[in-house]
Amino acid sequence: MLGLRNIILLSPPPTQITRPSLPPVNFAAVEDNNTVGEKVCRDCGNRAKKECLFERCRTCCKSRGYNCVTHVKSTWIPSSATRSSSSPSERKKKLKIDKQSSPNVSLLPTTTSRQERGFREGLPGKIEAPAVFKRTRVTAISNNEQAEIGYQATVTISGHIFKGFLHYYGVDHNKAFPCLSQK
C-alpha cells in the first residue's frame, strides 16, 4: 500500500472547455490490479462515472461548478415518493385478516444448524401467559398522515426473549379475541 488515499489533487474549474487537458489520476489502478479501468474522481478519489467529461464524482462536479451533463439527472428517489399514495383507511383494509380462510403459516429456516432446529422444535405451539404491553405512537414517514397507536411487547418464552409490535386493526365487533383490559 503506497498510502495514496490521502492525496487530494485540486484543479481550478475549467473555462468553457469540453474535455479537461490533464490525464486522469487512477488511484484504484495503483492500489489494486483488479479494478484497472475504473474511473476515479480527480479531486477526492471516489469512483467517477465513465461518461463524466471532467472525470469527477457527482459531488465534486457539483461543488466545483462544472456544467456536467452526466450528473444532471439524479438516480436517487426519496422513499416518500416510492410509497403508494393510499390513505390510512385503504391500508387498514389491506391489513385486515380474512376470517373465512384459515391462516397458513410456515416457518422458513434462516440457518441450518442443529442448535437452531432444536431450539425451534422445543418451543411450545401456543402460550397463554401475562405479558407487558407498552403503548407507543406510530408515525408514518409521509407528511400528511396522523400518528397511530400501537403496543410494543416483550416476553420471555422458555428462557428466550421475544419482542414484537402490535398494530391497531380496528374494533373487534365479533368478540373473536379475548379482552386483556377493561379500560
UniProtKB/Swiss-Prot annotation:
Task: Report the subcellular localization.
Answer: Nucleus
Q: Which residues bind DNA?
A: 41-68
A Pfam family of the record is DUF702
**Where do the record's region annotations for Disordered lie?**
79-121
What biological-process terms (Gene Ontology) are attached? auxin biosynthetic process; auxin-activated signaling pathway
User: InterPro entries, from UniProt?
Assistant: SHI (IPR007818), SHI_C (IPR006511), Znf_LRP1 (IPR006510)
Task: Mark out the compositionally biased spans (Low complexity).
Answer: 79-88
Q: Where is this motif: Required for homo- and heterodimerization?
A: 157-160
Q: List residues binding Zn(2+) 2.
A: 41, 57, 61, 68
Q: Which UniProt keywords apply?
A: Activator, Auxin biosynthesis, Auxin signaling pathway, Developmental protein, DNA-binding, Metal-binding, Nucleus, Zinc
Query: Which GO-annotated molecular functions does the record name?
Result: DNA binding; DNA-binding transcription factor activity; metal ion binding
Where is the sequence biased in composition, kind Polar residues? Answer: 100-113
Q: Which GO terms describe its cellular component?
A: nucleus
The record's principal subcellular location, in a coarse class, is nucleus
Give residues annotated as binding Zn(2+) 1: 41, 44, 52, 57
Question: Of which family is this protein a member?
Answer: Belongs to the SHI protein family.
Q: Which NCBIfam families match?
A: LRP1_Cterm, put_zinc_LRP1
The protein's job, in short, is:
Transcription activator that binds DNA on 5'-ACTCTAC-3' and promotes auxin homeostasis-regulating gene expression (e.g. YUC genes), as well as genes affecting stamen development, cell expansion and timing of flowering. Synergistically with other SHI-related proteins, regulates gynoecium, stamen and leaf development in a dose-dependent manner, controlling apical-basal patterning. Promotes style and stigma formation, and influences vascular development during gynoecium development. May also have a role in the formation and/or maintenance of the shoot apical meristem (SAM).
Descriptive protein name: Protein SHI RELATED SEQUENCE 6
State the organism named in the record.
Arabidopsis thaliana
**In the UniProt record, what gene is named as encoding this protein?**
SRS6
